[in-house]
């Protein structure tokens, strides 16, 4: 789980992330599609997956908005993300491995945007946070 120190580091970096959520989200999604093209199958209704795509920008806001909610509820990530998990598991039928892949892409985007602030300690805390998010999203797949 997340330690008190992890939570402090996560909230600190996320204060900076919130000022650039759309750009970071778009960068992470574009990287996901380039590095893991199989993930595009869930976005076949998007005619444009380029960084300028309005639909991609909108989805980036939704994804980062959900992560912001999780940051604001670090002691209860599973309940916080329950509805999102349910939609992805039962309606959209997303292979849950994609959450982990997007997490990796998000970590790269954070490191690129916040090179000075993304210390090894922050990286570890964010990695642990994203693991908790992934576990929460996996919850309704059972």
UniProtKB/Swiss-Prot annotation:
Keyword Iron appears in the UniProt entry: yes
Matches recorded under SUPFAM superfamilies: Globin-like (SSF46458)
Single GO MF annotation: oxygen carrier activity
Binding site for heme b: 88
Record-linked Pfam families: Globin
UniProt-listed GO biological process terms: hydrogen peroxide catabolic process
GO cellular component: blood microparticle; haptoglobin-hemoglobin complex; hemoglobin complex
InterPro entries found in the cross-reference section: Globin, Globin-like_sf, Globin/Proto, Hemoglobin_a-typ, Hemoglobin_oxygen_transport
Ranges for domain Globin: 1-142
Tissues expressed in: Red blood cells.
Keyword presence, Transport: yes
Alphabetical keyword list: Heme, Iron, Metal-binding, Oxygen transport, Transport
Leader peptide range in chain numbering: none
Record-listed O2 binding positions: 59
Subunit structure: Heterotetramer of two alpha chains and two beta chains (an easy dimerization is also reported).
Function noted in UniProt: Involved in oxygen transport from the lung to the various peripheral tissues.
Family as reported in the entry's similarity comment: Belongs to the globin family.
Protein name: Hemoglobin subunit alpha
Species per Swiss-Prot/TrEMBL record: Latimeria chalumnae
